[in-house]
Swiss-Prot record:
GO cellular component: endoplasmic reticulum; intracellular membrane-bounded organelle; membrane
UniProt-listed PANTHER family: CYTOCHROME P450 26 (PTHR24286), P450, PUTATIVE (EUROFUNG)-RELATED (PTHR24286:SF384)
GO terms under biological process: paclitaxel biosynthetic process; sterol metabolic process
Protein name: Taxoid 14-beta-hydroxylase
Function according to Swiss-Prot or TrEMBL: Catalyzes the conversion of 5-alpha-acetoxy-10beta-ol to 5-alpha-acetoxy-10beta,14beta-dihydroxy taxadiene. Also acts on taxa-4(20),11-dien-5-alpha-yl acetate.
Gene3D superfamilies assigned to the protein according to its UniProt record, in alphabetical order: Cytochrome P450
Subcellular location: Microsome membrane
Family: Belongs to the cytochrome P450 family.
Length: 509
């Protein structure tokens, strides 16, 4: 009799799981049949007027080749091969959708300058549940512009000047606590900690370590779920992400309610951080943002500002380690700023604006390794472009990889040459350099990211005389959508042999 217990257990588990199994089977069938019908329909449609190219295999199109190119750092080759065969406008099929890729500045302009005219942002509903259906990413038209106006109350250059001291102190404390005193560190790990600390401090004024760590843990789970298979069942990444989003909402809701009380009682000011700015914002009609809009936008901002900034900052340090002459120019620029300060003087907006060469280094890093791969749009009408028709409902893709590494737009594009961005020289042609996107949906927080990278480099130079990579041959890889040094980029640190301050005057060394 005992020998049948395993069988009974298996049957019981099957009966218990049957609804879930049935759901998966039906979803699989639908996932096969519906794309097949769409694929056959697209094949039957007259090809006259459509851009040249190939849709690949049924169901998967060229998605696997595309993802392989992302993970193997061969995106440029993936695109170049198709441009060579079909030209600067070609069709393919990516992530289950017929897609037209537009290459070059003219194609970039068509997509980025025609939001809500010819194209609109398009994300899967499953992703929007995690990113926020009332976030700036999901909003369109007037709703998008209202949220953008709210964000500009914090992210505009004029507003950011108020937060330089707070950001600078957060960075200085982080370097003193987690970098200084260590002979060797992992740059990617510590930069990740730093970027999240800055966001937690300036977005919510959260200073407690355990609260920051809990937020970070939830955001990591959500980030994995955004592009996961959208199955809301135990054991699936998407299910875990939905649960994490619910917990994140509970934490943020508590912060919102407390801040409302603090604002009412005078314990908080209207501009002390992004949360206060959001809560006190009113549109042209005098309407405030709803709590749901604030929740959704904070979730999206925390995720969006983290990955891209960590990528950019880590790659800046990696490229400076490989180009000592450029690093020396950065050092001299930063020490020049310090030489004009007395001990205890804070960094000012004028100081940040004077970090011209350091900013050129960041720009050149983003040209070589853009933090965003590009983005998809959906055609909201038939689009006539370069003699072709892009049908309504098709996806369009723009990517900086069609201009950033090209000789026709940047001389010697394979070289790390920060001076190419010297604004006193030749200006970069429009729609060729797009590290922050463009048009209505350009990154609203790019000035914030610029400031935190420049201030981080400043405090690093102030603390360390130099650094050397443990593995100079380590590459920058795009294993995820954001490029990062492949093994965390461990470096040996060499602190300055004595303080930059002698008496009250900063000493240049």
């Amino acid at each position: 009799m005992d020998v049948f217990y395993p069988l009974k257990s298996t049957v019981a588990k099957f009966n218990e799981c049957f609804p879930a199994i049935l759901f998966i089977v039906l979803s699989a069938v639908a996932g096969i049949v519906l794309p097949l019908l769409l694929f056959l329909r697209s094949k039957r449609r007259s090809s006259v007027g459509l851009p040249p190219g190939k849709l690949g295999y049924p169901f998967i199109g060229e998605s696997l080749l595309f993802l392989k190119a992302l993970r193997s750092n061969t995106v440029e080759q993936f695109l170049d091969e198709r441009v060579k065969n079909f030209g600067n406008v070609f069709k393919t099929s990516l992530i289950g959708h017929p897609t037209v890729v537009l290459c070059g500045p003219a194609g970039n302009r068509l997509i980025l300058a025609n939001e809500e005219k010819l194209v609109q942002m398009s994300w899967p509903k499953s992703s929007m549940k995690l990113m926020g259906e009332k976030s700036i990413t999901a909003k369109r038209g007037e709703g998008h512009m209202i949220i953008r106006s709210a964000l500009q109350g914090f992210f505009s250059p004029g507003a950011l000047q108020k937060y330089i001291g707070q950001m600078s102190k957060t960075i200085e404390n982080h370097i003193n606590e987690k970098w200084k005193g260590n002979d060797q560190v992992s740059v990617v790990a510590l930069v990740g900690d730093l970027v999240f600390d800055i966001s937690a401090c300036l977005f919510f004024n959260i200073n407690e370590k355990h609260e920051r760590e809990r937020l970070f843990e939830l955001l990591e789970i959500i980030a994995v779920g955004v592009l996961a298979v959208p199955v809301d069942l135990p054991g699936f990444a998407y299910h875990r992400a939905l649960q994490a989003r619910s917990k994140l909402n509970a934490i943020l809701s508590g912060l919102i309610e407390k801040r409302k009380m603090d604002l009412s009682s005078g314990l908080a000011t209207s501009n002390q951080d992004l949360l206060s700015v959001f809560l006190t914002f009113k549109d042209d009609r005098g309407n405030p943002c709803s709590d749901e809009e604030i929740l959704d936008n904070f979730s999206g901002l925390l995720h969006g500002s983290y990955d891209t900034t960590v990528s950019a900052m880590a790659c800046v340090f990696k490229l400076l380690s490989s180009n000592p002459e450029c690093y020396e120019k950065v050092v001299q620029e930063q020490l020049g700023i310090l030489s004009n300060k007395l001990e205890g003087d804070e960094i000012t907006w004028k100081d940040v604006k004077s970090m011209k060469y350091t900013w050129q280094v960041v720009q050149e890093t983003l040209r070589l390794y853009p933090s965003i791969f590009g983005s998809f749009r959906q055609a909201i009408t038939d689009i006539h472009y370069n003699g072709y028709i892009i049908p309504k409902g098709w996806k369009l893709l723009w990517t900086p990889y069609t201009t950033h590494p090209k000789e026709m737009y940047f001389s010697e594009p394979e070289k790390f040459l920060p001076s190419r961005f010297d604004q006193e020289g030749k200006l970069v042609a429009p729609y060729t350099f797009l590290p922050f996107g463009g048009g209505q949906r350009s990154c609203p927080g790019w000035e914030f990211s610029k400031m935190e990278i420049l201030l981080s480099v400043h405090h690093f130079v102030k603390t360390f005389s130099t650094f050397t990579p443990v593995d100079p041959a380590e590459i920058i890889a795009r294993d995820s959508l954001c490029p990062l040094p492949s093994n965390g980029f461990s470096v040996k640190l060499f602190p300055r042999s004595y303080s930059l301050h002698t008496g009250n005057q900063v000493k240049k060394i």
